[in-house]
């Protein structure tokens, strides 16, 4: 559903009419503490002494609300229309997060649910042809007209290699237990409840 909504928004640029409305998209990982987030879920059941883990290999991107808002503001300032902005953020293993949130709990592997993915993919190989890297984010340019080769859109971006994939399992930056704990401590008051 996310991919479909991205494509619909980007395609909306071709139908903006005389008003010239432009649409761009931001992609990022799970917002820490948002409704249904795993951190408040783990916290709410830690008294049982066991945390359910879908799969020991599962990885995720996690972003604070502030980081998400910063990316949205950057997109507003930078966009021409049709771009997809992807925030660079570290990956984490769900087992590491469970250990940090509730170190006293056992972890029980419960199996993957239908439709659930082991890893989050933010940029697929098919997007690599139109993706540019910047210090804080990636930008996937639209394939409409010659928009993907427009210097106005590329600016100082560096083209990613053909076949590039940005996913939570192949990310070069990983959160250690200490970094996860510091991150939770810093953002703890913003972690919501289910």
What are these regions (language model features)?
Residues 1:
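Active-site helix of classical SDR
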């Amino acid at each position: 559903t996310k991919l479909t909504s991205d494509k619909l928004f980007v395609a909306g640029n071709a139908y903006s009419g005389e008003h010239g409305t432009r649409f761009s998209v931001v992609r990022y990982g799970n917002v820490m503490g948002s409704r249904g987030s795993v951190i408040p879920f783990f916290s709410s059941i830690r008294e049982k002494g066991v945390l359910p883990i879908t799969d020991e290999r599962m990885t995720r991107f996690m972003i604070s609300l502030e980081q998400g808002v910063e990316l949205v503001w950057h997109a507003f300032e930078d966009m021409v229309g049709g771009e997809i902005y992807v925030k660079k953020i570290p990956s984490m293993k769900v087992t590491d997060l469970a250990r940090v949130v509730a170190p006293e709990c056992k972890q029980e592997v419960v199996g993957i649910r239908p439709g659930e993915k082991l890893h989050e993919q933010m940029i697929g190989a098919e997007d690599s042809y139109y993706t540019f890297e910047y210090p804080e984010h990636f930008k996937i340019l639209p394939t409409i007209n010659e928009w993907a080769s427009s210097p106005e859109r590329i600016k100082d971006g560096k083209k990613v290699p053909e076949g590039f994939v940005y996913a939570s399992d192949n990310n070069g930056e990983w959160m250690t237990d200490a970094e996860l704990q510091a991150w939770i401590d810093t953002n703890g008051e913003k972690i919501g409840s289910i």
